[in-house]
From Swiss-Prot:
Binding site for S-adenosyl-L-methionine: S120, G121, S122, E138, R143, D167, V168, D202
Family in the record: Belongs to the class I-like SAM-binding methyltransferase superfamily. TRM61 family.
Any one GO cellular component localisation term in the record: nucleus
Catalytic activity: adenosine(58) in tRNA + S-adenosyl-L-methionine = N(1)-methyladenosine(58) in tRNA + S-adenosyl-L-homocysteine + H(+)
Superkingdom of the source species: Eukaryota
Any one Gene Ontology molecular-function term assigned to this protein's record: tRNA (adenine(58)-N1)-methyltransferase activity
Protein name: tRNA (adenine(58)-N(1))-methyltransferase catalytic subunit TRM61
Amino acid sequence: MVEVFDKYKDLIQEGDLALIWISRDNIKPVTINANETFNTRYGSFPHKDMIGKPYGSQIAIRTKVAKKFAFVHVMQPSPELWTLSLPHRTQIVYTPDSSYIMQRLNCSPNSRVIEAGTGSGSFSHAFARSVGQLYSYEFHPVRYEQATEEFKEHGLLDKNTIITHRDVCKDGFTIKKTDETSYQFKADEEQLQIKADVIFLDLPAPWEAIPHIDSVIDNDEKVGLCCFSPCIEQVDKTLEVLEKHGWFNVEMVEIQGRQYESRRQMVRSLDDALERLSDIKKRKLAMVERRQKAEEELEKKIEANEKNLPELPPKSIEKSKFNPFGKGYRVKEGDANFQWKEVTKVESEIKSHTSYLTFAYKIKRNEDENLDKN
């Protein structure tokens, strides 16, 4: 399988592709070089400090200006982390969608998968880790070259991935010797025999590619298809063509992912509420007494014709340190002086719609038998 993304190693070595975790939404791919430094707004992290450390280690530095500590984590690449850090060439398939698609299509080490188009290569890495053979197609020449170079660096082309520059909507999926492809043809081989049992279409017009699928699928297997479509209008056209070409068990699914965060909530008892009310009452009475005293002193000064009149005290109430509700005096979450309970909180920004997933299945052998009977 894939070396960089599939074989785990303990220690960081020079030349490794590592993912620097700055924050949950900020992960950067870096090739480790002892003479280089990884720069962030929090500080600079020399690569030599990372070499020899276990993957997952926290690399900390002390900033000169603020005299505070800054840190990052060095992670080993995986398809899931790569999805969060890769350079975007197109819209990508995120892990909530890709994991569901692979489970729904029963992908396994024996699966032979067709993926069109390659795009940014996010799903390609997940497929390459889990399936037996991956045939990936990209019609855009620049994206094809970028993906080919990336797959080569990550070890995908040496294992189970073949990428081809081809417009499958017009020219179909058959890989010929004249095509620009990573597959190495033999001298007497004119075209590559593909018997796929899983099809994934991430195309603007998947309905144009569906008629070409029959020539490259396994006649003896149940073939699963998934179309990744951002617009419902694309789904409508795809459904018409799927029905026309004999696909069955058609179903459309939309994945909505939410992230739940672990939090602690202060336990509020009746005694706390009564104590807080008592605390508020004491502070108000103290404020009234101070103002009355200040007013009396002011009247005496006026009567004595003093020129420099004292200022009235501020109207704000002096904050008390007791506050079980977190108002006024700041209470830090998890403070040992208070009682807490574990709760969950949904992330504030819910991820919006990505795409519709249209699933369908086909057994070509049954089609051929029906044609023979007719």
